[in-house]
Amino acid sequence: AVTTGGLRIEIVSVSSILTKLRSISVYGDYYGIAFYDTNFILDKYDGKQNTFVISNELKKVIKRIPVPYHDRCPSDAFCLSPDVHSIYFTVEDRLVTLDINGKELSTFESDDLEGACGITVDKNGILYCCGENSQTVIQVTPAGRQLGVLLSSDDGLKNPIGICLNTKNNVILITERESDEVKMFRLI
């Protein structure tokens, strides 16, 4: 499922090509989406309040989770921990961890994470986070300890904003601002 930043959520099938299966109309602007079990978590921002909305198959709202720093902007990206007990999101220069009820567990900041954007997590809970302005991808433990800079401008990054980890092939896909290319890096 993907959001278009508008009033629809597109359900797509991913194989060698993307195939749109159906569209779901929603009310309000949604900026991100995650899926677990039969539930969607949506990042909704109405210009005043940023909220994570948990919805059962997009039919019924199960829970609304107010997001810290909601007065600044919508979160740039978010993902769920592998055990689905935590929500990780980026906002400004921060990586924030909430429990599934919205309680803030930790906030991570680093000079290596300026303009925090895209975020993903591996099956061990290690977070991979893009710093658009620092031109980096860093690794952070679930406890909020930085493991290091994985990729930087020395590796050809320029304003990384989106990241996806394919654990089956040990590949990281990165999108960059003002580029229509997807960069692929293999983890060794």
Feature map (PLM): residue ranges:
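Beta-rich, blade/repeat-based domains predominating
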Residues: 26-44, 68-86, 90-93, 112-126, ...
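Blade-level signature of beta-propeller repeat domains, shared across WD40, Kelch, NHL, RCC1
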Residues: 158-188
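WD40 beta-propeller blade core
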Residues: 9-10, 50-53, 96-97, 106, ...
